[in-house]
């Protein structure tokens, strides 16, 4: 599913403030990682990253490509490609709690300041 900034902000509002990260930061990260598209899969050095949050099949989820995954989120990676963001958010929060926000490489260079553009005007 291709989200818009405002629709995604609505879906992710319960993540605002989790681990000290604002909703605008999440929206910015997701834009740069997946373009707000839930069906994004990126192959990288033999690993794959899935969905809005680009969650990795080596550590966080399991797929047919990497049966040795640590699968910390205890989930099949393809669950991150559907329209239901409940499991995506759960795993992203787990990643944030364990690894910190810089797990998402877009954060530091692109999403740590000037965040007004990532806010939905409705609020």
UniProtKB/Swiss-Prot annotation:
Keywords: Calcium, Disulfide bond, Lactose biosynthesis, Metal-binding, Milk protein, Secreted. It comes from the Eukaryota. Disulfide bonds join 6-120, 28-111, 61-77, 73-91. Mammary gland specific. Secreted in milk. GO terms for molecular function: calcium ion binding; lactose synthase activity; lysozyme activity. Coiled coil: none annotated. Residues 1-123 form the C-type lysozyme domain. GO terms for biological process: defense response to Gram-negative bacterium; defense response to Gram-positive bacterium; lactose biosynthetic process. It is found in: Secreted. InterPro entries: Glyco_hydro_22 (IPR001916), Glyco_hydro_22_CS (IPR019799), Lactalbumin (IPR000545), Lysozyme-like_dom_sf (IPR023346). Ca(2+) binds at residues 79, 82, 84, 87-88. One of its GO terms (cellular component) is extracellular region. Lactose synthase (LS) is a heterodimer of a catalytic component, beta1,4-galactosyltransferase (beta4Gal-T1) and a regulatory component, alpha-lactalbumin (LA). Regulatory subunit of lactose synthase, changes the substrate specificity of galactosyltransferase in the mammary gland making glucose a good acceptor substrate for this enzyme. This enables LS to synthesize lactose, the major carbohydrate component of milk. In other tissues, galactosyltransferase transfers galactose onto the N-acetylglucosamine of the oligosaccharide chains in glycoproteins. Belongs to the glycosyl hydrolase 22 family. This is Alpha-lactalbumin. It comes from Camelus dromedarius (Dromedary). The gene is LALBA.
């Amino acid at each position: 599913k291709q989200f818009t900034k405002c629709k995604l902000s609505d879906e992710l509002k319960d993540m605002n403030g989790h681990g000290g990260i604002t909703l605008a930061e999440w929206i910015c990260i997701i834009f740069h990682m997946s373009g707000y598209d839930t069906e994004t899969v990126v192959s990288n050095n033999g690993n794959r990253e899935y969905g809005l949050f680009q969650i990795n099949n080596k550590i966080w989820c399991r797929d047919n490509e990497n049966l040795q995954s640590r699968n910390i989120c205890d989930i099949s990676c393809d669950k991150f490609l559907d329209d239901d963001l409940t499991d995506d958010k759960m795993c992203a929060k787990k990643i944030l709690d364990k690894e910190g926000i810089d797990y998402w490489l877009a954060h530091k260079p692109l999403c740590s300041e000037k965040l007004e553009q990532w806010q939905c005007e409705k609020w």
